[in-house]
Amino acid sequence: MFEIHPVKKVSVVIPVYNEQESLPELIRRTTTACESLGKEYEILLIDDGSSDNSAHMLVEASQAENSHIVSILLNRNYGQHSAIMAGFSHVTGDLIITLDADLQNPPEEIPRLVAKADEGYDVVGTVRQNRQDSWFRKTASKMINRLIQRTTGKAMGDYGCMLRAYRRHIVDAMLHCHERSTFIPILANIFARRAIEIPVHHSEREFGESKYSFMRLINLMYDLVTCLTTTPLRMLSLLGSIIAIGGFSIAVLLVILRLTFGPQWAAEGVFMLFAVLFTFIGAQFIGMGLLGEYIGRIYTDVRARPRYFVQQVIRPSSKENE
């Protein structure tokens, strides 16, 4: 049997990108939620290359009296999951909770995640109830969740919700993975022995706009497909086999028709031949594009460049920067 250790210290990791309007309320509510735990805690805010005043506000929050805030400033924008991984590399708690800065998932849910983790779960996920997002966002999220469930076989309901809790050994395992394209909820479930999801409240976004545009969602789907599974490559092999068999069958059919109806039929079949040819060419280009995606990601990983570059770390115990 695996021994269940009680949670002694909680680390809350929050990526921040152009969220200066929501930061004061975010810090206040997250601090209040952590204070109610009766445990040691720290709040790590990672500025992901914001162009507004977010970074300056984080530094001030870390340097405030009796602060529990660690500010991590990245030199540019690397994306939500890379920013979270930067936070993971600086946590000191034995339970790590991730939270978005837009306050759509309320920080007041943190005690529930901690309580569930204390029951012995490695990963505590959440499912958003009554989502307050646009039709497009909800539809895209459903498609992504179904894609993940089919490719991984993990029947989790809401991979897009970043309000999650991870035991320290799960975070350490993720930090040992060096692929550039990382989707944290899936990666964590690969290493988790026991995982569970709980329902949480979902609010409308009060400040700013969502940072996930249409193209970023498309890129996310490409990342998920090429990072999670090689099934598309196997499907290409299957498609190639079907096309080859179909082409051979059509060739045999053309020979039979020519022998049956004479050479004059061949001229009348030119347009069909062109249609078949264009179908094969289109299938080849689709396959080449998919192979290019895989090869491009292999090339990116082989270069072994860091996921992010930390420009500055400000801890509450000292006003000196790391």
Curated annotation (Swiss-Prot):
Residues in the Cytoplasmic compartment per record:
1-235, 291-322
- Give the reaction(s) catalysed: UDP-4-deoxy-4-formamido-beta-L-arabinose + di-trans,octa-cis-undecaprenyl phosphate = 4-deoxy-4-formamido-alpha-L-arabinopyranosyl di-trans,octa-cis-undecaprenyl phosphate + UDP
Q: Print the keywords alphabetically.
A: Antibiotic resistance, Cell inner membrane, Cell membrane, Glycosyltransferase, Lipid A biosynthesis, Lipid biosynthesis, Lipid metabolism, Lipopolysaccharide biosynthesis, Membrane, Transferase, Transmembrane, Transmembrane helix
Localisation? Cell inner membrane
Q: Which stretches are Periplasmic in the membrane topology?
A: 257-269
Species of the source:
Escherichia coli O139:H28 (strain E24377A / ETEC)
Q: Membrane topology type, per the record? A: Multi-pass membrane protein
Instruction: Write out the GO cellular component annotations.
Output: plasma membrane
Protein's recorded name: Undecaprenyl-phosphate 4-deoxy-4-formamido-L-arabinose transferase
CDD domains annotated for this entry? DPM1_like_bac
Family, similarity comment: Belongs to the glycosyltransferase 2 family.
**Parts of the chain that traverse the membrane:** 236-256, 270-290
Is tRNA-binding included in the keywords of this UniProt record? no
Task: Give yes or no: UniProt keyword Ligase.
Answer: no
InterPro entries recorded = ArnC_tfrase, Glyco_trans_2-like, Glycosyltransferase_2, Nucleotide-diphossugar_trans
